[in-house]
Amino acid sequence: MSSVTTPAPVYTWTADEAIKFLKEWNFSLGIILLFITVILQFGYTSRSMFVYVIKMVILWLMWPLTIILTIFNCVYALNNVYLGFSIVFTIVAIIMWIVYFVNSIRLFIRTGSWWSFNPETNNLMCIDMKGRMYVRPIIEDYHTLTVTIIRGHLYMQGIKLGTGYSLSDLPAYVTVAKVSHLLTYKRGFLDKIGDTSGFAVYVKSKVGNYRLPSTQKGSGLDTALLRNNI
């Protein structure tokens, strides 16, 4: 005897159920979206490093969440058209995520900084202060960079880096590391304000995939590519 297979029932949402779901979860979704919006709006390195790190985590999680959703759409596609678009979106998302990791690893090899895995930018500014390398992300490679010292506190492009420095500690060159090349900025202007404050302006002078001589005597290290733990 042949058994008759009963098709599985297809569940569909009604308008009333959708409205009920929104009413039940509207407050929670609003709070979550407000939190994400505030983080994305005010997450800058020059304002709060803690908020900026949270922003980077949110941006980083976007890729795996997108890939998961596109794969889910492939498995539960409504029809062949949706399936085709879902497959394309999945492939694009995976390729872009792989490219992100490849570029981040290349930048990490160049700088040795975990900021290389920043999902927002591939530009890392580097400054060597008395043998200690500071690396921080910037959105773009500007034509000039400003380094400021206010009562011993070191700032670069408005980002606080450290304390206990004077104008005499500022190097002649700073760099911006990118995935494929290195940008060198030469100090073009230095002005002292008071006894413990002042600023220096660095102007872009060279672009290429090369190394700078070390400022540390006898160390044999390359200043621009110096590994750091800061």
Curated annotation (Swiss-Prot):
Its main location: virion. Residues 1-24, 77-84 are virion surface. Keywords: Glycoprotein, Host Golgi apparatus, Host membrane, Host-virus interaction, Membrane, Transmembrane, Transmembrane helix, Viral envelope protein, Viral immunoevasion, Viral matrix protein, Virion. It is found in: Virion membrane; Host Golgi apparatus membrane. CDD domains: HCoV-like_M. Component of the viral envelope that plays a central role in virus morphogenesis and assembly via its interactions with other viral proteins. Homomultimer. Interacts with envelope E protein in the budding compartment of the host cell, which is located between endoplasmic reticulum and the Golgi complex. Forms a complex with HE and S proteins. Interacts with nucleocapsid N protein. This interaction probably participates in RNA packaging into the virus. This is Membrane protein.
